[in-house]
């Protein structure tokens, strides 16, 4: 027991010491607030602190100064506003000029504050609060009232010097929390759905419209419906339903239901949320081959099935065609019908078929950019190329035939009696060198062409396999020989290719007649009897023209024994995998006509006359 008393004594001593220590803390005098109730006057209040020697009246002074003043001034009224206050009436109040105030004791300053009057406006509380009953509900449980009050008597609200907003707060008598309504300018505020069996407390406060600080609350107004003679009727509606318990039990039941559904449909939900990964399966291929990495066997299976081939591989058309090698070394030394068809002149003339097709047998045409339905441009190209080809081939055959005849014949008969055919004669100067006869040049050129004649004799009897007779099921083209074309006219090679060294610009008439006579057709036209050409005689264009016309007339009278048949040697377009469209070569063009002119024949005119 003694120990307990000792401990209790120590606790009391410690408590007294703490209280005395807190009392010993010095609190300096401080300005508590400054307020203007009506924006015309204002007052400032302060506290003395715990300085006992400063509690006497007049010990602490309040000094003030406006912005434009230079000296501090003492408070004009310490009595009107109460103890420890200073009142500034309208004569000392300037609304738009800032003030500075401070608490001093002789030379010691305790507190200082600066402000303007419009910032410290705190209106007085409203007065004369009252309420009236508006109506009650049909059940008699709730009622509506309207609360009224008057503005503060100090605020000049009626003249508009200051505008006030009012805030109403109410609560039940037994509650601690006040319910607030939105601030409004009106002095009448309705309250709805108040319970008739309860008593309420109402209070109101105001503030300046441009300020955020409210003034003091008014006196509390008590509202009791029993005072108005309204009896409270207990009703079943007043009994509160335990909504909170209903919400709790409902949430628990819903959670249990969801859990049961998840447990019963676990496998199906798992399939929906996490679908199974499909096993790699290829029709006709064992998945174990892919797992073991046997790619060679998989590739062999894929290659053996057409279903795994690409669409382009299945739909691609392949056309077999005839490949012609124009540079075969075995064929260079011998002349054949293939060389004739595929000679350099022939290929050059066919600009459409001049390049070799190296597309590995894929379906193609010599004119890939030209549509199949438009044959105008391609036909023109083929026709022109065929005409040039036929002319060149015909000229070469005629030259060979001419050389053959020259070699077989012993000699050309000399042209005699040229004096009787030429009306005009002229003699050469005696000092000029005699011209070698034209026939001598022909005889000199004959041995050089004899070797070609032996090789070309077989060419004239060679058939050209240029006609398509059949197309095999495999797509190959069967060619058959065409009809032999007889050359209707021959041309001497030495007349066009041999160059003469001319001493002057005229020619012997006998030499020219020899050349013209050879040009005529050898099969139907008889040989022209040659005359001996005098070295000192010349001919004119009239005699040459007469001879050319007579020879041309005799040639025209004798028809050609065989009409040349065109050979289809140019592939125009691939019509289908088993069809070809060929172009025909053009027929030979007529011979050149002699120009009718008078006078002697110059070298240029002779070149024009000689084909």
UniProtKB/Swiss-Prot annotation:
What compartments host this protein?
Answer: Cell membrane
- Region Required for JAK2 binding: list its residue ranges: 270-355
Domain named Fibronectin type-III: residues: 125-228
Q: Which residues lie on this side of the membrane: Extracellular?
A: 21-240
The annotated region (Disordered) lies at 411-455
Q: Where is this motif: UbE motif?
A: 316-325
- Transmembrane residues, as ranges? 241-264
Q: Where is the signal peptide?
A: 1-20
* Motif WSXWS motif per UniProt: ranges: 214-218
Instruction: Give the molecular function GO annotations.
Output: cytokine receptor activity
Membrane protein topology class: Single-pass type I membrane protein
Sequence motif: Box 1 motif, positions: 273-281
Function according to Swiss-Prot or TrEMBL:
Receptor for pituitary gland growth hormone (GH1) involved in regulating postnatal body growth. On ligand binding, couples to the JAK2/STAT5 pathway.
The name of this protein is Growth hormone receptor
Which gene is this protein's source?
GHR
